[in-house]
Amino acid sequence: MTFDDLLPRVSPAEAAELASLASGPVLLPGDEGYDAECLIYNLNVPLEPALVVGAADAADVQAAVRFAARQGRPVSVKTTGHQQVRPARGGVLISTRRMKGIAVDAGRRRARVEAGVIWQEVMDQAAKVGLAPMSGSAPLVGVAGYTLGGGLSPVFGRSQGYAADHVRSLEVVTADGELRHVTPDNDPELFWCLLGGKGNFGVVTALEFDLFPVTSFYGGGIYFPGERLAEVLHTWRIWQADMPEEMSSSVAVQRLPPLPALPEPLRGAFVVHVRFAYLGSSVEGERLIAPVRAAAPALIDTVEETPCTAVGALHMDPPTPMPYYDRTTLLRAFPAEAADKLIELLGPGSDSPLASVELRMLGGALDREPEVPNAVSSRGLPFVLFGFGVGTSERGEFLSAELEAVMNAMEPWADRRRMVNFLSTEEATDSERLKEVYGAERYRRLTAAKKAYDPTNMFRVNHNISPG
């Protein structure tokens, strides 16, 4: 039990007072619409706030933050709920999904989007003028949370860096209830903290970022039988080392559910899913991926010229909420010994219960500091490993142990830093572990800024950086 669990309920009169100041709905537990606003992607971490504000604009966010400040309550933020690591008990949940403004400036190759926008909406708008954003693997993820956590694009990452590296300005409501327009020039420290520090410093209501003059890429996925994991993984491991920055790739060991929506060869199958995205000609792309394509007979091969609006087809991330447990680590190297460990733990003789364990190439521009620095902590590391298992709390201990076994096996090659957007609930709520996630120097700087911008730790329903 935490201090927030002991906070009193918000009374109907208090909620009504806030509702008189807001244009969006204000909801208490039991109200119609409350449960829908609290729904998130990981059903094992239910949100249970004392009050929900369905913000329609930045003024609603300000009203919610000021209300929380008067009552000494924490504030949490949700657009789609892809990374909610605490239940928000006793707090004010600001739901931004109604804030849907999108403005694409084709001449400047930029977009300004409000906090409730998801990536598919930006992709569709940008494509109309021949541009594309640095969206992630899941097109239904919210732009703001993804970008504030760094933002790893499976298409543009290795050639352009993190999504956070291309942010030009942010509009954010800080703990004092003020709406600030933040740029590298007018508040360089807050700008640095927001991009990588995620939701610890305020509620971002809008952001402006670069777009790229790209309409398609050569990419897709090849599904191999899981029984050929050894050949495919070792081939991919050797192959990726010589790839140009324009090529991005990942490999996932997956045990797929028997869903009718899946093609018959994949239904309930044990597979190795290799994904590719090449920013170049299809002829050159086909030549580059040929060694992996030849590693084993494929079940399905979807690699082709692909519009940027269809980036979700690369990873085929689950589109609906489910109960799951996950873990992640960053690797300094992935030698043959590391590949053999994964084959032992995940291969055809393992009976692994994990739904997916994937390894993504990093490197290239992801290693380089951007022109305007930010707090993204994962530069200089060539791989990120991420795994998840599907199951409710009854299987939680079992699935967590299986995930830990995989991550522990990678320990000889692992770094102590992590990608913030990939943190599990267990990792994100371990205050000592968070210091390692960012590294000592970066964490000290974030802590100092937290004391300045959020001294009471209002924004703590997250991977919390405490003001001390």
What are these regions (language model features)?
Residues 1-468:
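Soluble FAD-dependent oxygen oxidases
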